[in-house]
């Protein structure tokens, strides 16, 4: 899917918080005059002091922004960003976004439903915004430049400015050289072209590969594990169950952050499982030379494999998206496909829907009953819990069978031609001839 992604953090350099701009925005959203008067009274003449080293500085007047820690600050800022988004979308063209077709009736895995000419609907993605972090997707450099200019104009009208040092541009498809990227500017400043950038803690790459994101997640989890090692994991006063509970709440959550939207391959799952087992070995006080199987390690710690923990999050997220109202963007994207772009010749990238379908089959859940089960939250959670338990049992059974085959192969009597001089058994005639040179 050919699209340009950009990360646009807004810098709160000139936020005129409770100035005329904010008052106009709140009045536009229907706030009564009495509320606006009280709100301005809270902030007019506001002073602050800085605490450092147990001492307080002299009071100074605060002319911009809202009070730190005020319960109204998040609401005011959200309304502020809504006003910015509405103004931004009113000044861009429809073709500047990323169009996609969607159809909400039928089963998720029935791709033929999107081939209908009259039952599909069209929607556009213009921006993906979370607080003051925004990503602008576009299919053309011209549309991206117009969208960025419109967003910059909207921010300036609201008293904000785009931080050009933290704003980058990334182009797909795979193999696109950043040096050939079109020049996109903000207020005359060209933006840096990169092959990857971090958005909301997740590393997004131009080739859509999860390898870098997996390594980043493991680094973050390792840092969290290291900070807790002396206080928790090496603390002999704590029980193993307590240590595993802390590990699962902090380290596993960090390792699998954002995994709800992953489309992993087996190599990614293997990397996660290796790190997962290493952490459990350190918690249980085991070393590699103890030669304890992974199944036994997880059983002692009373925790599931990294794959099962990841699939649990993904199935829970899919059920949540399916239950969303029909006007929500995640719900439409799950049941849609991009208008532009083609899947290449040969084996294409695995889609998220393909991964979910394969997971349901491994859990003995019929893909055709996805919408029916997910519509009831309790029934869906129960089906996922039972299905993942069957998946974990099947995985454990396969691992034990492989171990039994390896043990049987190692203990079986060797067969093959033997050396007439020393009696050594060789694997083949060629090996025997090579060995006979030793007795010449």
Label each residue range with its predicted role.
Residues 31-35, 50-440:
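Short linear motifs embedded in intrinsically disordered, charge-biased segments
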Residues 1-27, 71, 136:
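Conserved catalytic palm subdomain of right-hand nucleotidyl-transferase polymerases, strongest
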Residues 47:
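Exposed beta-strand and adjacent loop surfaces of beta-rich binding modules
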Residues 36-43:
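Short, well-structured alpha-helical segments
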Residues 7-9, 15-18, 44, 182, ...:
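Low-complexity intrinsically disordered segments
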